[in-house]
């Protein structure tokens, strides 16, 4: 029983890690929190690229 629970926990842990990697790749290498902060900036087209917030991205 403990082995099954351990496998389920390991699967969930790996799944969460994979989702984080995919989201990071989609957001040009920026964390989800940084992307949210960039979107709150008061500029024309805020975005996050290479770990920094930029204005005017297309």
UniProtKB/Swiss-Prot annotation:
GO terms for molecular function: toxin activity. Keywords: Disulfide bond, Secreted, Signal, Toxin. It is found in: Secreted. Contains 4 disulfide bonds. Residues 1-18 form the signal peptide. The keyword Secreted applies. GO terms for cellular component: extracellular region. Its main location: secreted. Expressed by the venom gland. Belongs to the scoloptoxin-14 family. This is U-scoloptoxin(14)-Sa1a. It comes from Scolopendra alternans (Florida Keys giant centipede).
